[in-house]
Amino acid sequence: MGSQLALKSRIRSTESLAKIFNAQEMIASSHIAKARDVALNAKPYTDAIFDAVQALVAHTHITHPIAVKDEKNPRVAVLALTSDRGMAGPYTSSIIRETESLLSRLDAAGKQPELFVYGRRGSTYYKYRNRDIAATWEGDTDQPGVEIAETISNTLMDAYMKPAEKGGVSELYIVYTEFINMVVQKVRVLRMLPVEIVKNETKVPDPDEEAPATADVAPLYTFEPSLEKVLDAILPKYIQSRIHECLLTAAASETASRQNACLLY
């Protein structure tokens, strides 16, 4: 009799879990299309900002912090984008694994990484292991807004622009999950600052060939009031747009991972 009651209890528990997973899968499937579209729609703006920054920092003799790293300052900032909720398969564990790998590489290189965490699951993981965390943010990791991107970017900007003797950092890294499609999401490590110049391949022009189109010729810029002032103005927009894009593609990845995980049960 006792064994029958135990079996019935297990059956009821299994049925309850199945209902929970089914509900989670339905919620995730209703969110994924919007999350994917929002992430894709934000990309052109971020790409335009990045192209503008690339054009600015490509100028020689630039000494602005956006492009020049303080080699004497070993402190670097690492932002890990995790999730608030579970039931998302290996989503958060993959981010934590890559973050730990990055922290180890930075330590081996003589750096002093400072950890910033977005998402309750990640902050709980590191707090449980008594890891020092410079700052944490929680709430709406599957639907991040511009406000949280601005808050995070302001904190990281303050850390980056602060002098080394006052605890500033010389580099900014972000660990996030890029949404490829519903099945594939890849963990990425992006160094946001200093900006790395992406150089295009060039070749010596042939006199017999036609001149390149105007779109292929690098434009000449005149900066008013100065290049440094322009960089001061564009730097906050660059950081916020990059972080916002990472938050959006991470949210789409989290939702897709949650839907896929629930489908397995």
Regions found by a protein language model. Give the residues of each.
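Conserved loop-to-helix interface motifs that mediate assembly, gating, or partner/ligand docking
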Residues: 2-261
